[in-house]
UniProtKB/Swiss-Prot annotation:
Enzyme class of the recorded protein, top EC level: isomerase
Protein name (record): Phosphoglucosamine mutase
Organism: Methylobacillus flagellatus (strain ATCC 51484 / DSM 6875 / VKM B-1610 / KT)
Classification lineage: Bacteria, Pseudomonadati, Pseudomonadota, Betaproteobacteria, Nitrosomonadales
Catalysed reactions, semicolon-separated: alpha-D-glucosamine 1-phosphate = D-glucosamine 6-phosphate
One BP term from GO: UDP-N-acetylglucosamine biosynthetic process
EC number: 5.4.2.10
Cystine connections: none
Keywords recorded for this protein, A-Z: Isomerase, Magnesium, Metal-binding, Phosphoprotein
Single GO MF annotation: phosphomannomutase activity
Family matches, as HAMAP family: GlmM_B
Function of the protein: Catalyzes the conversion of glucosamine-6-phosphate to glucosamine-1-phosphate.
PANTHER family for this protein: PHOSPHOGLUCOMUTASE (ALPHA-D-GLUCOSE-1,6-BISPHOSPHATE-DEPENDENT), PHOSPHOHEXOSE MUTASE
Residues forming the catalytic site: 108 (phosphoserine intermediate)
Amino acid sequence: MSRKYFGTDGVRGKVGTFPITPDFVMRLGYAAGRVLTRMDHHLVPGTKPLVIIGKDTRISGYMFETALVSGLCAGGVNVRITGPLPTPAIAHVTRAQRAQAGIVISASHNPFDDNGIKFFSAQGTKLPDEVELAIEAELDQPMELVPTEQIGRVKRIDDAAGRYIEFCKSTFPNALDLRGLKIVLDCANGATYHVAPPVFHELGAEVISIGTQPNGLNINLNVGSTHPESLQQAVVEHQADLGIAFDGDGDRVVMADNQGQLLDGDQLLYIIASHRHQRGRLGGGVVGTLMTNLALEHALGKEGIPFQRAKVGDRYVLELLNANEWQLGGENSGHILCLDKHSSGDGIIAALQVLHALRASGLSLADWAKRLPLYPQVLINVKVAQRIDLDSNTALQAAVTSAEGALKGTGRVLLRASGTEPKIRVMVEGQDRPLVQRLAEEIAAVVQQEAAS
């Protein structure tokens, strides 16, 4: 069944453009409340479902928080609001409070004038497809206020940030600390701005913070994991041991070594996996995505670590991890899931697992990076006016086959349609950068030619 509103990560778009409008968000809250009330069979008769609401630091978050609360209460749901907190913090609070669902108001790494609504289940995971479809169906029904005595109540959880800080610290071994480490933290002027610095400071690190002055308009603006240049520069200027950058809602992380060299999600995933494997604590294999660098797959294979690829998106990484009963997976963008530590991807917790590996091994971040030199990877986004069937187009298939022959088994070619934009993504990777660049450009030219025909 097709979806009208929900994408792979909730509802997202430009503020003021449908569906990211106050009236729709209020209706979304009402619809979610009605569905949760009908579906939760564990409620004590006469009690109401409980929903946790958090947000990042976008100025529109206040407006949408009020709209959601109004809709949920009108549907007979009690609400607890946390204020600005990372997306994974809401997953944690939802589980800890035994709530029926959690809702995050965020557009992740997007600019401030975007926003979105995403849901967590009672288990702190993405909502099942059938629940999202039920909410969409309810959205098409008229709003009918519950009887006055059944209207929900709203309260604030004043200590939500402190609870989450302690939860993050609990994922780092008690026998280790971060004393002697100078760390630059880039919080993207986003949801981690007031929780990440205390976590690393209380574990003993000397913390230098940037991107911790949100004003509602500067989230992800030239800072954070999607703009790591500020982090790299700050690490060098402060002669820090390493740097850590999060995205606006705190579920992504990238790091920089003491020379300011960037490590992406693939490299961080390797550090965690290799360290755990050496100590017999990996708990199975590792899940990446179609975009995961081939060097990671090869490096894990040499260490005897199973590796599988999921579709792009942390939702699909989680699905494959659960299917295999594995614990560790992630994306090169910095979404890293450590399911033995948390139910969802968490930038702070992922960074702590990397630091655990550094402390336990005695190696620096630069030392670890040398163990996984990434293969050159060229990605070209080709705008297309009309949809192209990538599987049946003979010209494209011939171009891909020719490129794979030129790589001689030392690389990969990937063609995929963007899920959010009218683009075809052409990715070629291998060990010979000039060859990879040429092959990617040749395939992109064929895509353009076929799109125009």
